């Protein structure tokens, strides 16, 4: 998405980042925040206006030097948790209670971490399996965005999440 946005909007109007804030889409234009998280955005010359806007809106903002690491870290977590919860129709924490689901979640986390390594991206954690399990535990009652999409008959992010990993991985086979 980052590259597409730059092509269409220009580098000065795009910032790479990630957030740890969860949310539930309640309806068109209506979202319920799932707790206070952090918005991490890569620091670059054009970030000033965006930084001011986010801070004035009282978002918890962190400027970082390597947002790519955070984006891929989030990709590891999302690819390990979201598709499984959507397929099984269960909240995040239940992945830890089902041995076969936990095994697949671990394999997915390792696979995405391997692709990140092939892309020369340093993840923000050393153990992708532990990171995915920690997030599943911390968000045990949450229903992933992909599960929410399935339940309301909306398109999912399967291509944006898993497809991104497949496309990156194909470059290294």
Each language-model region and where it sits:
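Rossmann-like NAD(P)(H) cofactor-binding subdomain of soluble oxidoreductases
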Residues: 1-30
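Short, hinge-like loop/turn segments at secondary-structure boundaries
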Residues: 10, 31-35, 79-80
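Short beta-strand and adjoining strand-loop segment in the mid-core
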Residues: 29-51
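Active-site-proximal catalytic alpha-helix in oxidoreductases
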Residues: 68-114, 140-141
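Residues at the C-termini of beta-strands that transition into short coil/loop
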Residues: 18, 35, 65
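NAD(P)-dependent Rossmann-like dehydrogenase/reductase catalytic/cofactor-binding core
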Residues: 55, 106-173
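FAD/FMN-dependent oxidoreductases across multiple families
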Residues: 48-82, 130-131
